């Protein structure tokens, strides 16, 4: 793991802002997300997470769609958001929520010059939009960054490395789900309840200070500890069992 990746993971674990250039991307904690509404929160992330192919396929005019497919190499995802007033409005509302500010505007008239300006000083454009979205996904949406492997395209190697860890965390969650449920996916409330019940320091009162990244990391680690204990017990009857220590990287 590179020093840069370690630094990024430290900030994710600490719940601190991650910077894309001079833009601070601060994760919301569970309490803030609960107050906003988890579904609304996830919808805001999903809106800005569309791929270029998804954007083109969503266009009803087949002639325009065919032309955009032929010229796809000329465009970035940000350009597609800026081509439509309706999509511009959705992007503004998403950034309103995710950056917790009403001061979000579209600046510029020509496509190449258009940008989203937050609080009058933070500029998101076609050059850094992918990086901003990638970091928001890593902080707040492990389901997207870890499970949609074919569609998820991290904007840089640091994000890719952390996304791999999130994928492993998600796999641990899925294994636990397979053992304990009837096949329905674990929900965020399920994970919050499980962590607050298993943890020695977190409870129903203070768990809301965690970010989603911290919650998933805590759940994955607690699950590894539980699995380690089971492996130790099983090794008494079957010495061939390979024991993975709970402190091993997730």
Language-model segments: residues:
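Hydrophobic, aromatic-lined core segments that form the binding pocket/scaffold
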Residues: 79-181, 185
């Amino acid at each position: 793991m590179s020093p840069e990746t370690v630094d990024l993971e430290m900030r994710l674990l600490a719940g601190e802002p991650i910077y894309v250039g001079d833009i601070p991307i601060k994760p919301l904690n569970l309490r803030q997300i609960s107050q906003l509404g988890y579904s609304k929160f996830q919808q805001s992330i999903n809106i800005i997470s569309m791929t270029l192919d998804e954007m083109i396929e969503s266009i009803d005019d087949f002639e325009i769609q065919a032309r955009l497919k032929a010229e796809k190499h000329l465009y970035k995802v940000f350009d597609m958001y800026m081509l439509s007033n309706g999509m511009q409005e959705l992007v503004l509302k998403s950034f309103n929520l995710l950056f917790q500010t009403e001061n979000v505007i579209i600046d510029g008239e020509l496509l190449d010059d258009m940008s989203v300006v937050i609080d009058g000083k933070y500029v998101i454009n076609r050059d850094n939009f992918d990086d901003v979205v990638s970091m928001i996904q890593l902080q707040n949406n492990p389901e997207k960054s870890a499970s949609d492997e074919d569609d998820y395209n991290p904007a840089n190697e640091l994000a890719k490395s952390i996304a791999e860890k999130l994928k492993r965390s998600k796999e641990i969650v899925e294994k636990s789900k397979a053992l304990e449920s009837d096949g329905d996916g674990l929900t965020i409330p399920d994970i919050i309840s499980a962590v607050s019940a298993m943890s020695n320091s977190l409870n129903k009162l203070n768990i809301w200070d965690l970010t989603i990244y911290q919650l998933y990391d805590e759940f994955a680690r607690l699950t590894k500890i539980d699995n380690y204990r089971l492996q130790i017990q099983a090794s008494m009857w079957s010495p061939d069992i390979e024991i993975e220590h709970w402190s091993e990287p997730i």
